[in-house]
Curated annotation (Swiss-Prot):
Transmembrane segments: none annotated. PANTHER family: UDP-N-ACETYLMURAMATE--L-ALANINE LIGASE, UDP-N-ACETYLMURAMATE--L-ALANINE LIGASE-RELATED. It is found in: Cytoplasm. GO terms for cellular component: cytoplasm. One of its GO terms (molecular function) is ATP binding. SUPFAM superfamilies: MurCD N-terminal domain, MurD-like peptide ligases, catalytic domain, MurD-like peptide ligases, peptide-binding domain. Its main location: cytoplasm. This is UDP-N-acetylmuramate--L-alanine ligase. The keyword Endoplasmic reticulum does not apply. It comes from Enterobacter sp. (strain 638).
Amino acid sequence: MNTQQLAKLRSIVPEMRRVRHIHFVGIGGAGMGGIAEVLANEGYQISGSDLAPNPVTQQLASLGATIYFNHRPENVRDASVVVVSSAISSDNPEIVAAHEARIPVIRRAEMLAELMRFRHGIAVAGTHGKTTTTAMVSSIYAEAGLDPTFVNGGLVKAAGVHARLGHSRYLIAEADESDASFLHLQPMVAIVTNIEADHMDTYQGDFENLKQTFINFLHNLPFYGRAVMCVDDPVIRELLPRVGRQTTTYGFSEDADVRVESYTQTGAQGHFTLARQDKELLHVTLNAPGRHNALNAAAAVAVATEEGIEDDDILRALESFQGTGRRFDFLGEYPLEPVNGKSGTAMLVDDYGHHPTEVDATIKAARAGWPDKNLVMLFQPHRYTRTRDLYDDFANVLCQVDALLMLDVYAAGEMPIPGADSRSLCRTIRGRGKVDPILVSDPAQAAEMLAQVLTGNDLILIQGAGNIGKIARNLSEIKLKPQTSGDEHHG
């Protein structure tokens, strides 16, 4: 490491100049990879391990990181610190080796907190909408010439990366409540989009514990910091009196400090007015569909307005917003004639939403923007515990589409739970009489089974957080043509 690189490190995190080599266990995850990318660009030696290559590991390798596709004790040799994903168990051989060598082992949020320590941190928390809101704040700050650093849990499509090192004092980051590690962060501004029961295993199944953890997170703000909170959310409204910090509220509610009014949607664009205290009305065109995205934009505008960013910069950023990967992600519109012999087209949209509230928001956005389309969903439930805990909510939400295909539950390391599987969920939905679900036990048959339900005027939602995104990409690459064996005619 040369003198210039050392000087650069001292300017970012003064005491971290003692650190040379940072190793990440589970480096291919979006949150881990984003932090690794920022640190690589700051001049640190980066290494990491994961089970298989993906776009995140490819990007890091292009920046000079050493990537191992195995977990072995020798991978942590010479590391100054080991950063571990919450998905990694404590008996991982690299973790064991690090402890034996007395190398510090920390969670990703602790490293993110160090990056934030000497910057003006803006942390975006909440059950839903974190990734998109983080990208919106980052886009506005970039449009205003503020050159922020950002670390996001999803791909920021305009930048083509999950994270980027800026050269200003601003750091905008997604704050993850799934393992309560966001308590390590000490931002200047915190957004909370909403609070629902999710990741309840972290909170001992106690919703009060989850709510108190969000309060504790907000109390990490300095007394002169600001909490920006969605007052439409009933839990946030309940908690507001307990937030001992300056607050700005936003939402469709009449008493919101930043109020969304007159929302309409045309295709993928939302149009609405934002009313702000002691400011001119802001007439917004947002290049992202759905009322939920209008709320995300309102949060971003609240932060930008507080920072003194010009309205013209805000409006330009929102109108040109390119979204994030796997959040109502348009993959194309394809002719159906090669697929099933029918005339017309099918739009293909990939979406990460895996909680009933998120799936409902995606369906509503699709209905509002394309009301005449036949709405077809290929859904992959994520985790048996979530399917069990939110079973009735899933059944109610999934009844809203015109045709439903369902993959088996993506276990994410969990053991099956009787009655919380896709077959049971299909049976329950079928019993409600609104839609007749099709169980797709073999993902390789997804294209062929989709072809059976397409009408010629379709919007296909590929929905879920597991490996279903690969199916979406495969469908787009084969232009929706079914994979048939021998028989080229499929009706």
